[in-house]
C-alpha cells in the first residue's frame, strides 16, 4: 500500500481485468485476431485503457445486454464519479440476476461514496450471503470502520485476511478512497492491521504497519506494549527501536 488509505473495491466479476488486458495485448500483435472482437470485448479494452466514456458508448451499443454488461456500464460511470448513473446500472444488473454478488457489492460502494454507511453495510452483507469474497469482507470492514464500529470492522477485516492473506497488499482495482478519514483514524486502522498480521506470524508486515501507525501519531503505545498479539514482536530489535522513537504526526 503506498500511502495505505483504506479503500473500497469495485467488482467486475472473475478474471474481467485479466481478460481485458489479454484483449489489449492482442490488439498490439502484428497478426490479425482470429475473429472479430465483440462489442463487449471492445468495451473491455476501452475500460482497461481508462477510456470510460467510450466504453459506455460501446457497451450501450450492444443489443445483447445482460447483467454482466449492465454491471460494467455501472463501473464505467462509477469511475467517472457519476454515482447516480452507476447505481442505476448496478440495479439493472441485479434485476436481471438477483444473486449477482458483484453488482450488490458495487451498489454498496455507491452508498459508501455517498457516506450512507449503514446502507452500504446492508448491501455488502447481501453480497456476502452469495459470495464468500475477501474483497467484499474488506469493503464491509471499511464501512464499519467509517461508522467507528471498530470491533465489527476488525472482524470483517479478519475474515478478509483469512480468505486472502494478501488482500491488503495486492488490491489494484480501487474504487472510492476513504480520503475523509483523519490521521487518527488512519493510525487506528494501521494498528488493527499490524495486530492481525502479528497474530498470523507475518512479522515483517506487522512491523511495517506498527511503524505506519506510530508515524501517524497512534496515541496508545501501551496497547503495543501489552497486547498479546505483539508478544513475539516485542523481542525484536526493530520493534524496540520503533517503540523508542518519538511519535510524530505526518
Where do the model's predicted regions map?
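Structural signature of tandem alpha-helical TPR/SEL1-like repeats
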Residues: 48-57, 79-92, 114-126, 131, ...
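Long, contiguous interaction/recruitment modules in multidomain scaffold/adaptor proteins
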Residues: 2-37, 48
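Short coil turns that delineate tetratricopeptide repeat
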Residues: 33, 64, 98, 131-132, ...
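Alpha-helical segment of the N-proximal tetratricopeptide repeat
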Residues: 34-82, 109
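Canonical tetratricopeptide repeat
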Residues: 41, 72-75, 106, 139, ...
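Terminal, low-structured helical/coil segments at or just beyond the last alpha-helical repeat
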Residues: 21-36, 180, 184-187, 197, ...
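Position-specific recognition of the canonical hydrophobic site in helix A of tetratricopeptide repeat
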Residues: 47, 71, 75-78, 95, ...
Amino acid at each position: 500500500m503506498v500511502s495505505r488509505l483504506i479503500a473500497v473495491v469495485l467488482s467486475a466479476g472473475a478474471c474481467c481485468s485479466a481478460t481485458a488486458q489479454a484483449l489489449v495485448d492482442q490488439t498490439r500483435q502484428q497478426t490479425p485476431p482470429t475473429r472479430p472482437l465483440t462489442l463487449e470485448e471492445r468495451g473491455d479494452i476501452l475500460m482497461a485503457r481508462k477510456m470510460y466514456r467510450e466504453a459506455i458508448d460501446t457497451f450501450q451499443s450492444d443489443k445483447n445486454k445482460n447483467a454482466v454488461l449492465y454491471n460494467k456500464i455501472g463501473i464505467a460511470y462509477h469511475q467517472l464519479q457519476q454515482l447516480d448513473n452507476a447505481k442505476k446500472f448496478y440495479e439493472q444488473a441485479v434485476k436481471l440476476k438477483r444473486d449477482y454478488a458483484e453488482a450488490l457489492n458495487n451498489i454498496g460502494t455507491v452508498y459508501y461514496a455517498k457516506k450512507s454507511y449503514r446502507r452500504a453495510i446492508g448491501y455488502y452483507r447481501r453480497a456476502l450471503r452469495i459470495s464468500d469474497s475477501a474483497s467484499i469482507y474488506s469493503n464491509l470492514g471499511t464501512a464499519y470502520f467509517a461508522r467507528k464500529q471498530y470491533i465489527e470492522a476488525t472482524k470483517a477485516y479478519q475474515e478478509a485476511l483469512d480468505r486472502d492473506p494478501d488482500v491488503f497488499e495486492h488490491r489494484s482495482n480501487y474504487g472510492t478512497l476513504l480520503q475523509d478519514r483523519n490521521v487518527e483514524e488512519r493510525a487506528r486502522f494501521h494498528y488493527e492491521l499490524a495486530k492481525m498480521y502479528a497474530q498470523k506470524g507475518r512479522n515483517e508486515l506487522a512491523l511495517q504497519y506498527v511503524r505506519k501507525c506510530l508515524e501517524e501519531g497512534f496515541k496508545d503505545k501501551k496497547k503495543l506494549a501489552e497486547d498479546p498479539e505483539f508478544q513475539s514482536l516485542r523481542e525484536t530489535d526493530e520493534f524496540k527501536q520503533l517503540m523508542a522513537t518519538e511519535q510524530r504526526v505526518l
